[in-house]
Amino acid sequence: MKMILPPIRERRAVDRLLSAFFQKYKATDFKKAIAALCRFYHLKNPKVEWFEYIDWGRTAGKTYENGQIYLVHPENWKKGRKYNSERRWISTVYHEMGHYVFWADAENKADIFASRMVRGVNHHR
C-alpha cells in the first residue's frame, strides 16, 4: 500500500513542535503541529481532549470515527507510565493522527470514490 506523507521538512517541523509541547506544555505548539498535518491532508483539525489516563491506564490514545481524539497529556504521561519517554508519546500522537487521517470524512471519500469509479465507464453514451 502506497502512503502519501508530508515532505521531510514538514515532518521535522511537526516533530519539533510536538517535542516542544511535550517539554513545555504550550498548547500552541501542539495546535500548530496538528494544524500542519491537517493542512497537508486537507482535513479539519480534530477535537483533542486531554486525560490523566484512558481505559484504566492501558491506553495512551483513542480516536473515534467522529474525529474526536483522546490523548494522555504529557504531564500525566511522564508520571504514571512504565514507558514514559518523549519519543513514545510523540509516536502515540502520530498513531492516533493516522487513525484520524484514514477515518476522516468517510462518507465524502466514499462518494468521491464511487463517482471516480464510474467516470468514463459509459463513454459510448
Task: Annotate each predicted stretch with a short phrase.
Residues 25-45:
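Zn2+-dependent metallopeptidase catalytic core
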Residues 19-29, 107:
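A short, highly charged nucleic-acid-interacting micro-segment common to nuclease
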Residues 8-22:
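A short, surface-exposed helix-loop junction/capping segment
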Residues 6-9, 123-125:
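Long, well-structured alpha-helical subdomains associated
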Residues 49-87, 100:
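Active-site scaffold of zinc-dependent metalloenzymes
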Residues 91-103, 111:
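Active-site recognition of the HExxH zinc-binding catalytic motif
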Residues 104-125:
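Post-HExxH zinc-binding segment in Zn-dependent metallohydrolases
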